[in-house]
Amino acid sequence: MNHSTGNCSSKENFSADTTADLKVEEVPEAVINTLSPRREHFTRSCSGGGPRCNRESLPGMVTQRSCVYGGARVVLMPITDAAHLVHGPVGCAACTWDIRGSRSSKSELYRMGFSTGLEEKDVVFGGEDKLLECILEINEIHSPSAIFVYSTCVSGVIGDDIAAVCRTAENKTGKWVIQVQSEGFRSFNKSLGHQLACDVILRHIIGRGDAEVRENSVNLVGEFNVAGDLWEIKGLLEKMGIHVVSSITGDSTVAEISEAHTAQLNIVQCSKSSGYIAEEMKRKYGIPYINVNFFGIKETMDSLLSISDFFDLNAEERISSMAEKTHEMIRGYRRALEGKKVAIYVGGNKAWSLIRAFRDLGMEVIMSGTQNGLPEDYLKIMEKSGRELILFDDANPVELSELLRKYRPDLVVSGAKEKYLSYKLGIPFCEFNHDRIKPFSGFGGFLNFAEEVKRTLESPIWTLASKKRLSGPGGMSGEA
């Protein structure tokens, strides 16, 4: 019996010309080998779009993200003369103590950690009495200008009426006692915590002072004085005759922020954490704002020129002279760093500003990722890069180690959580987030950054410890 059909009964039906026209598209190589639900979080910029982002982390993935409470804490904590009381288990306060790395020229109270230390019995019987007792004790011992009370997951779940306790405490102490409704479970993205903290500043602090309006006055919004960055920026502004009313929130006091509504301009350094404040102050007080970036020579120069244009200061020649002098000073660093490859894993705003900075040093960014990036962040990264690079979102330690092992950058730029992973792989690491000890903002700060990168890459340790590669999650073996 013949089972063949008329359509495909024999090879003779396929001509040589037909087979020559058959084309099979090449399957693109995966960026790294990871779980299938995570593959879209890793991409190449040449594919035309960024990675999948702004999504809940995959359960069990050991994400390196922070929570809503952590997002609120990093915005408010740099207010130097306030007490920051965490209404939750002691671990919540411990994990975020000094998390910002902010420096102060005023009070050091903000660096003290306060927690109600909720335990099992408080979950059963409630923690309101404990909270009130803690607030009264803090006020008696430290007499802060204000007390911020942070909600956490536990206090949110058990339903403590923190707002009522804060009102009672205000009546008893005469101080501002302000609830920050920052339960960690409210969102997968800490950016909600940023907005909640901004709401607290807008509703409870800004507008309560009564200072006179001064000429050429600004607020520095979204500047947290990490390692003294604020002081570098203020120095540049003062040379131009600019008066800084307040910094929101680095090296600030409650009184200074209460007078922020008297400024003539808001200059926004980190739009993701504090752009919301600038928008609301424009709506409520009519204060215009401009976005600035004081990391890198070109970015610092452009930011100062924008401020100069707003106030009609005619400072172009002075600003250009400072920028040119800085270019002259980094030439030696550029010769030493030319052609080195860099991997970046930082916040969205930092990621794209670093690309231009490394270009000034003759270095090439080959991969860039963020923990809480938005689509527009990745688009800006691609725009600033102008070349193909690996993009990734919310990478866990195993994924990050695979990226570094596969693409072998000469330098990793990230934060404390990634430092020791990089060291274990034998790759030089530069701290850019909150644990660094030198300012990187402004012209002087960029020289510090160039020196830090050069010193890191030229450390003798890398001649003694050859680069390794991970053999798996549990160990390390083999040469790169």
UniProtKB/Swiss-Prot annotation:
Q: Where are the annotated coiled coils located?
A: none
Q: What is this protein called?
A: Nitrogenase iron-molybdenum cofactor biosynthesis protein NifE
Concerning InterPro entries, the annotation shows: Nase/OxRdtase_comp1 (IPR000510), Nase_comp1_CS (IPR000318), NifE (IPR005973), NifE-like (IPR049939)
What GO biological process, any one, is recorded here? Answer: protein-containing complex assembly
Pfam families found in the cross-reference section: Oxidored_nitro
Species assigned in the record: Methanothermobacter marburgensis (strain ATCC BAA-927 / DSM 2133 / JCM 14651 / NBRC 100331 / OCM 82 / Marburg)
GO molecular function annotations of the record? nitrogenase activity
UniProt lists the family membership as follows:
Belongs to the NifD/NifK/NifE/NifN family.
